[in-house]
Regions:
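Short, well-ordered beta-strand segments in beta-rich or mixed alpha/beta enzyme
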Residues: 24-32, 61-92
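Acidic/histidine-enriched, glycine/proline-rich intrinsically disordered or flexible terminal extensions
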Residues: 122-133
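Bacterial N-terminal signal peptides
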Residues: 6-16
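N-terminal targeting signals for Sec/Tat export/insertion, comprising classic cleavable signal peptides
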Residues: 25-55, 82-83
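Boundary at the C-terminal end of the N-terminal hydrophobic targeting segment
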Residues: 19-21
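Positively charged n-region of N-terminal signal peptides that target proteins for export
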Residues: 1-5
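An amphipathic, aromatic/His-enriched active-site/gating alpha helix that lines ligand/cofactor pockets
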Residues: 47-60, 78-123
């Protein structure tokens, strides 16, 4: 019985090694972004998050999309490893988030200290896969 379990486990590990791309990970974020503010959101992303991300070790790039049916922005941020992504302190992220919120609030004519105009709807982690073969 144990021999069968060990064999099954070895097969699963071998298969997972072929399917999983590597140690890479994708950070997934969804934000509530009204249609009338999509351009403001993109400009603020370009001014604040993009330059900061480009300086982070392990940052590979990101995809940005907008879902008009739900009025949500989606960001898929590609990292070389989960450890590199998670090594970034929450304090550093908060500084950039405040800068982002400030840029957006200024564009909307709101107080610099107003709450985040694009609330986080979902935060997740995805593993990239390769098709077998």
């Amino acid at each position: 019985m144990i021999r069968k379990f060990v064999l099954l486990f070895a097969i699963l590990v071998m298969f997972a090694g072929q399917v999983l791309a590597s140690d890479a990970v994708i950070e997934q974020l969804r934000l509530k972004v009204p249609e009338s503010q999509v351009q403001i959101w993109l400009e603020a992303e370009q001014q604040t998050w993009q330059p900061w991300l480009e300086q982070q070790e392990g940052f590979l790039g990101r995809d940005i999309a907008w879902d008009p049916a739900h009025e949500e922005g989606q960001l898929l941020i590609h990292w070389a490893t989960r450890d590199q992504w998670k090594a970034i302190s929450s304090d550093e992220v908060e500084v950039v988030q405040r800068q982002f919120d400030s840029v957006v609030n200024a564009a909307l004519g709101r107080s610099d200290t107003a709450e985040s105009p694009f609330p986080l709807v979902l935060e997740g982690e995805l593993l990239p896969l390769h098709l077998p073969g």
